[in-house]
UniProtKB/Swiss-Prot annotation:
Record-given protein name: Large ribosomal subunit protein bL33A
Gene Ontology BP annotations: translation
Signal peptide stretch: none
UniProt xrefs under Gene3D superfamilies: Ribosomal protein L33
Family named by the database record: Belongs to the bacterial ribosomal protein bL33 family.
GO cellular component: cytoplasm; ribonucleoprotein complex; ribosome
Keywords linked to the UniProt accession: Ribonucleoprotein, Ribosomal protein
Family matches, as SUPFAM superfamilies: Zn-binding ribosomal proteins (SSF57829)
GO MF terms, alphabetically ordered: structural constituent of ribosome
Amino acid sequence: MAQKKASLACADCGNRNYSISVSSTPKPTRLEVNKFCKNCKKYTLHKETR
């Protein structure tokens, strides 16, 4: 199966800071990771968007 591109958006400001590749098979939940947001200048929760 092919990989699809997705981005990780900051939960606080909504800025899309990171891009990742995910499998194309459907999954019930989306990825949530604590990463550094350049806009907020702190570590925040980032959620997967497509």
